[in-house]
Design a protein with these regions (language model features):
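Rossmann-fold cofactor-recognition segment
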Residues: 46-58
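Conserved Rossmann-fold cofactor-binding substructure of NAD(P)-dependent oxidoreductases
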Residues: 56-68, 80
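N-terminal Rossmann-like NAD(P) cofactor-binding module of classical short-chain dehydrogenase/reductase
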Residues: 70-75, 95-96
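Helix N-cap at the beta1-alpha1 junction of Rossmann-like dinucleotide-binding domains, i.e.
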Residues: 34-37
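Conserved N-terminal Rossmann-fold NAD(P)-binding element of oxidoreductases
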Residues: 4-8
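Hydrophobic/small residue at the entry helix of a nucleotide-binding pocket
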Residues: 12
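C-terminal catalytic/substrate-binding lobe primarily of soluble NAD(P)-dependent oxidoreductases
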Residues: 149-405
Length: 405
């Protein structure tokens, strides 16, 4: 029997806690959050859980909270990752998060650091740490590796995510607006011709026809983990891939791009009529928060859903048996209304949270037990098969097509 602490019980963390509450090999779940109300509300709905108010800015607080736990699930913002990793090592617990670190040394450099020094730390302690285990990064990486393994060599991997959910009530984001705007205003990363390249936000726009959308949609480069980790692991697990990019599109991207071009996502102080203002602070003050509780999501749905459309594609291109080959993996998952009917979650929380829960379950079930620090594209075939099988039970599936040309 295993004890799990979930630190950060927002949409993804709470989903994982609920799923693990039903797992027969889990004896106790600690729901820890700075927001005491959120922790207690979640714990009251789970028969194996207890609530804990936690300020994770101090590693000693995290160590004290996690003492005796077998696994730490980190649902906090990126800046907490290394703090929580340090605590996991201190209490001899395995570790999982849903996106990698972005330390001041740089996105690529921070991944190099955890792939080397932190991998060794977890390996020497006989522990497993999984980084970037949500939907994207996470499921996207598993799909990419699955496709690449069918090829002799791989040239290009592209991850394309389009989100177009329009509701009568203005709801620009279904996850933290602070994280969303911050990510979109950050420089982009891609892996190009065997090297990591940075670019300006919203760079290299393309029009694409994606399955399930009856028109071409605009997609732009976006800061994300996959080009970084896949580039670093290109020769080890992705058959020498030379190009990896992540493109994003949809209503939230379009809004953010307009605000960015107006300077409203800047964190530099400006003076307006003798008042000093940080534009990003103003935007975040005025932006509606993401719906957090079921009653909030239900209220938005009841007010009216105008349009639900989206696509999640992982495309790998390379060579197989002397011919050029393209393998497309389209993810199928419940939309907003269906996700809420199934689990009182938004579509965003359902896909990312349930994907994260399957990765956690994989550790609980010892379906992946290698020691050290890993990202999902490093999973062997058996672990990938486990992920696909368990996700299918949650109506998250992948349609794969292969085309030679």
């Amino acid at each position: 029997m295993k004890t799990i602490i979930v630190i950060g019980v927002g949409a993804q963390g709470s989903t994982i806690a609920k799923r693990m509450n039903d797992h027969p090999a889990v004896s106790e779940i600690i729901c820890a959050d700075f927001d005491s109300k959120a922790a207690h509300e979640l714990s009251r709905s789970l028969d194996k859980a207890k609530a804990l108010q936690l300020d994770a800015r101090d590693v000693n607080n995290v160590i004290k909270a996690a003492e005796g736990c077998d696994l730490i699930v980190n649902g906090l913002p990126l800046e907490f990752n290394l703090i929580v990793m340090e605590a996991a090592l201190a209490v001899h617990a395995s570790y999982l998060d849903m996106a990698g670190p972005m330390e001041s040394i740089g996105f690529v450099e921070s991944y190099k650091l955890i792939f080397s020094e932190w991998h060794k730390k977890f390996e020497e302690k006989g522990l497993t740490a999984l980084v970037g285990c949500g939907s994207s990064p996470g499921l996207a990486n598993v799909i990419a590796r699955e496709s690449v393994d069918k090829m002799d060599t791989c040239d290009t991997i592209g991850i394309f995510v389009y989100e177009g959910v329009w509701t009568e009530r203005f709801t620009p984001f279904w996850w933290s607006p602070e994280v969303a705007f911050g990510d979109m205003a950050f420089k982009t990363f891609r892996y190009e011709n065997g090297a990591h390249v940075t670019d300006r936000p919203f760079s290299r726009p393309v029009m694409m026809k994606l399955r399930g959308i009856d028109r071409e949609v605009r997609m732009v480069d976006h800061e994300h983990d996959e080009p970084v980790t896949m580039g670093l692991l290109a020769d080890k697990v992705l058959k020498g891939v030379k190009n990896v990019d992540f493109k994003y599109g949809g209503s939230g991207v379009e809004l953010a791009e307009v605000l960015y071009k107006m300077g409203l996502l800047s964190t530099d102080v400006v003076t307006v009529k003798d008042t000093r203002i940080v534009p990003m602070d103003l935007v975040l003050k005025l932006c509606p928060p993401a719906p957090k509780y079921p009653a909030e999501i239900k209220s938005i749905i009841d007010d009216g859903v105008i349009l639900e459309e989206g696509a999640f594609l992982v495309r790998a291109e390379g060579h197989k048996e002397g011919s050029a080959v393209r393998i497309d993996g389209y993810v199928n998952a419940p939309g907003l209304v269906e996700s809420f009917e199934k689990s009182n979650l938004s579509h965003e929380a359902y896909l990312t949270g349930q994907s994260g829960a399957v990765f956690v379950q994989m550790l609980v079930d010892d379906a992946f037990s290698e020691k050290g620090l890993f990202v999902p594209e490093q999973f062997p075939a058996a672990a990938r098969r486990y992920c696909f099988q368990e996700l299918a039970k949650l109506d998250i599936t992948v349609d794969e097509t292969e085309e030679s040309y």
